[in-house]
Swiss-Prot record:
Disulfide bonds join 255-310, 300-308. The gene is beta4GalT7. GO terms for molecular function: metal ion binding; nucleotide binding; xylosylprotein 4-beta-galactosyltransferase activity. The keyword NAD does not apply. Pathway: Protein modification; protein glycosylation. This is Beta-1,4-galactosyltransferase 7. Belongs to the glycosyltransferase 7 family. Disruption phenotype: RNAi-mediated knockdown is lethal. RNAi-mediated knockdown in imaginal disks causes a reduction in the wing size and a distal truncation of the legs. Also, synthesis of heparan sulfate and chondroitin sulfate is reduced in the posterior region of late third instar wing imaginal disk. InterPro entries: Galactosyl_T, Galactosyl_T_C, Galactosyl_T_N, Nucleotide-diphossugar_trans. It comes from Drosophila melanogaster (Fruit fly). Optimum temperature is 30-37 degrees Celsius. Residues 1-9 are cytoplasmic. Beta-D-xylose binds at residues 209, 211-212. Expressed in male and female adults. Expressed in head.
Length: 322
């Protein structure tokens, strides 16, 4: 297991070497189970030379990570973090969320859903994959942006009611989005409800709108969105939004017939037909916190959703990775 501490003077580019997007540092050599030594300039910074390593496991052999049991909770939450090239944010996210959830006694485990193909980012499909991976052990999920950190301890990450999903980052609290049907940022969903809605649409490549389509799924399933009550903080002090729009530019490009198709309710795709391959499962420590990273290769049918690859080059590049 790799022990990653927050080292501000080292720039680490997101999971590029063995993780397909995160450069990994370990301050001491690991045992014989470790593979993939990194022979690169970062190894010298780590002081470990060839001992800079990560543990890689075949998905078929992977045992489900057990949650951190911080209390008497009978429920277990899988914290699903869709991810690509956000390692600096992840180094803040993991210790912050662990301390936050520990104060609430929430049994949980963090799963980083790392998209390593060359298609455009697909947050919804990654969540579908993460749910399939974790749902045997965990009875509810948190769909959680890596750049949104809760500050108010009254935001309870509790097991959602039978009414429907619990939206932690509601429009009256989120620092940026304030429309009534907004369900993005942080949404907690029961296992049975996510299955009932057939998860999320797989058609949303690039940034935005997948949450709006998911709101329609919630409504069509006869469920309701609930939100925390009696929160005294507001849009400026409930969350820390660590997204830098200049450093982390969003992929808002629209190509082919994407704009038209992604404004419709998707009745064809979801949890039951997301196409992917988990290339590797990595168990890591970030500030002594166990984290599971799934290297996920998503598949795209360019005949049905050509906007997954506006450049026309991603399909060939992804084929090389398989």
């Amino acid at each position: 297991m790799v022990n990653i501490s927050t080292i501000n003077w080292v720039f680490v580019c997101g999971l590029s070497f063995c993780l397909g997007g995160i450069a990994v540092l370990s301050l001491m050599p690991l045992g014989s189970d470790c593979v993939c030594p990194l022979s690169n300039p970062l190894a010298k910074l780590a002081g470990g030379g060839e001992g800079v390593s990560v543990i890689k496991k075949e998905p078929a052999d992977e045992k489900q990570p057990q949650p951190h049991d911080h209390g008497a909770s009978v429920h277990k939450m899988a914290l699903l973090v869709p991810f690509r090239d956000r390692f600096e944010e992840l180094l803040q996210f993991v210790p912050h969320m662990t301390a936050f959830l520990k104060r609430q006694g929430v049994a949980h485990h963090i799963f980083v859903l790392n998209q390593v193909d060359r298609f455009r980012f697909n947050r919804a499909s990654l969540i579908n994959v993460g749910f399939q991976f974790a749902s045997d052990v965990y009875d509810y999920i948190a769909m959680h942006d890596v750049d949104l950190l809760p500050l108010n301890d009254n935001l309870l990450y509790e097991y959602p009611s039978s009414l429907g999903p619990l939206h932690i980052a509601g429009p009256k609290l989120h620092p940026k989005y304030h429309y009534d049907n907004f369900v993005g940022g942080i949404l907690l969903v029961r296992r049975e409800h996510f299955k009932q809605m057939n998860g999320m649409s797989n058609q949303y490549w690039g940034w935005g709108l997948e949450d709006d389509e998911f709101f329609v799924r919630i409504r069509d399933a006869g469920l309701q969105v609930t939100r925390p009550q009696n929160i005294k903080t507001g849009t400026n002090d409930t969350f820390s939004h660590i997204h830098n729009r200049y450093h982390r530019k969003r992929d808002t490009q629209k190509c082919f017939n994407q704009k038209e198709m992604t404004r419709k309710r998707d009745h064809k795709t979801g949890l039951d037909n997301v196409k992917y391959k988990i290339l590797k499962v990595h168990e890591m420590l970030i500030d002594q916190v166990p984290v599971t990273i799934l290297n996920i290769l998503l598949d795209c049918d360019v005949n049905k959703t050509p906007w997954c690859d506006c450049s026309g080059t991603a399909a060939a590049a992804s084929a090389v990775q398989t």
